[in-house]
Amino acid sequence: MATSVQTGKAKQLTLLGFFAITASMVMAVYEYPTFATSGFSLVFFLLLGGILWFIPVGLCAAEMATVDGWEEGGVFAWVSNTLGPRWGFAAISFGYLQIAIGFIPMLYFVLGALSYILKWPALNEDPITKTIAALIILWALALTQFGGTKYTARIAKVGFFAGILLPAFILIALAAIYLHSGAPVAIEMDSKTFFPDFSKVGTLVVFVAFILSYMGVEASATHVNEMSNPGRDYPLAMLLLMVAAICLSSVGGLSIAMVIPGNEINLSAGVMQTFTVLMSHVAPEIEWTVRVISALLLLGVLAEIASWIVGPSRGMYVTAQKNLLPAAFAKMNKNGVPVTLVISQLVITSIALIILTNTGGGNNMSFLIALALTVVIYLCAYFMLFIGYIVLVLKHPDLKRTFNIPGGKGVKLVVAIVGLLTSIMAFIVSFLPPDNIQGDSTDMYVELLVVSFLVVLALPFILYAVHDRKGKANTGVTLEPINSQNAPKGHFFLHPRARSPHYIVMNDKKH
């Protein structure tokens, strides 16, 4: 049976050090068009999600991650130890499954960029063309990862700087020049438009995109154990991350919102739309650079998708290690890639992609359903995280931990309940059709989302119920936790949701 090796970690991670290894999560360029559809109120949504959801998740996860014996294993360990192994298995499964669906909006963004580069609109508009192209890209990227992940983190680092950070900086700079020139602005930015119109429920649906942008912080919580002064530095690091996310996402989203009217924003290609308008206004003689920027964005998101293919499956591998999955899922190739888990995830992605792209028309509705489905699946894991934390506070107050949410039991419960209620609110509004989906499409939106969610929701519980867990998974594999001292180069440029939590050690070789 696979085993886990505990490695000593020097407690030398500072506030800025922790911020640096977590900061990659605040850049979400492919979500900017969705943010922009809410106009100036996107700032309100970012503040709401940051204060009422991101901070509670970060604080609750950090305390659970520092309980003696729970330092490794993440959500699986925390939920298993508070609610039981069935729920722990479900929680980590939802984290694995949401990645499978989360690939779809990212692939749509890639196709949007590629359609601009090749001047081939059908690639972003025709469902069949879109489906075939997305499947080819997905499986081609997967093939690059089956050979091992030795260079994945380095590729992600280059992709982050050249394909995400640089285009985002150019977008913001062009938008600033556009605004300074006195060009017409598509939105109003004042105290009235700061708040969304709460009388229109459809306007609140976009909140799910903002929640998605904050998801994944719990994956970095284990590094709290490496901090020299977690009680002081960790809450400050969370505040810094929230401020950085709000500032960058606000500027990025508003750069699109003030240039493209909300009802004209293409969620897959909105960034390229914006670059086209900005460049034609600021420097029409070099409008060809839009295709260069599109290529950078394309490479950035391709690198991101590639880096997400193996990491979550390695995280899920801990369940195969504990024989909560059939033995076939414990299979590793010679390069340390859990091939059955990876292929299973990509098969789910492929099936969902085919259904959503062709049933939803391959347009904004497909993008929105994929986005909402990703969020509601992941929220199921967060429900368990918050409930597990409440159980920890009420039933296990004496368990030793190195970080405590300051303020005592009452404050801890308030933080967890606020996070849980915000999760429930986001979950409910996810099933409401957005304002830009009208007529018969609203019924199709709800039906597709509900049916898809129920199918995915049932998978972990069915698998847990039918699998005989009495045997042992004889894998001959050792898991060595990754920390800030032994992490591979470029590891922390990956989004926390995409990082492998441990090395795979086989035949004395570390992968």
UniProtKB/Swiss-Prot annotation:
Entry's Gene Ontology molecular function annotations: antiporter activity
Family matches, as InterPro entries: AA/rel_permease1, APC_superfamily, Glu_antiport
Where is the major localization of this protein? Answer: membrane
Instruction: Return the Pfam families for the record.
Output: AA_permease_2
Q: What sections of the sequence does the record tag as coiled-coil?
A: none
One GO cellular component assignment for this chain's record is: plasma membrane
Provide Cytoplasmic-side residue ranges.
1-13, 65-85, 148-151, 226-229, 323-337, 397-409, 468-511
Explain the consequences of disrupting this gene.
Answer: Mutant shows a 10-fold decrease in resistance with glutamate.
Stimuli inducing this protein: By acidic conditions. Expression is regulated by a complex system involving RpoS, cAMP, CRP, EvgAS, H-NS, GadE, GadW and GadX. The level of involvement for each regulator varies depending upon the growth phase and the medium.
Membrane topology per the entry is:
Multi-pass membrane protein
User: What UniProt keywords apply to this chain's record, in alphabetical order?
Assistant: Amino-acid transport, Antiport, Cell inner membrane, Cell membrane, Membrane, Transmembrane, Transmembrane helix, Transport
Where are the membrane-spanning stretches? 14-36, 41-64, 86-112, 127-147, 152-180, 202-225, 230-259, 289-322, 338-359, 363-396, 410-430, 444-467
Cross-referenced Gene3D superfamilies, in alphabetical order? Amino acid/polyamine transporter I
Outcome of altering W308A?
At least 90% decrease in substrate transport
Q: Where in the cell is it found?
A: Cell inner membrane
- From the UniProt record, list the reaction(s) this protein catalyses: 4-aminobutanoate(in) + L-glutamate(out) = 4-aminobutanoate(out) + L-glutamate(in)
The subunit structure is:
Monomer.
Q: What does this protein do?
A: Involved in glutaminase-dependent acid resistance. Exchanges extracellular glutamate (Glu) for intracellular gamma-aminobutyric acid (GABA) under acidic conditions. The protonation states of substrates are crucial for transport. Selectively transports Glu with no net charge and GABA with a positive charge. Also efficiently transports glutamine and, to a smaller extent, methionine and leucine. When the extracellular pH drops below 2.5, can import L-glutamine and export either glutamate or GABA.
The family annotation for this protein states: Belongs to the amino acid-polyamine-organocation (APC) superfamily. Glutamate:GABA antiporter (GGA) (TC 2.A.3.7) family.
Q: What is known of its domains?
A: Contains a unique C-terminal C-plug that plays an important role in substrate transport. The C-plug forms a folded domain and completely blocks the path to the putative substrate-binding site. Under neutral or basic pH, the C-plug probably remains closed and prevents substrate transport. At acidic pH, the C-plug may be displaced, allowing influx of Glu and efflux of GABA.
Q: What is this protein called?
A: Glutamate/gamma-aminobutyrate antiporter
- This protein's species is Escherichia coli (strain K12)
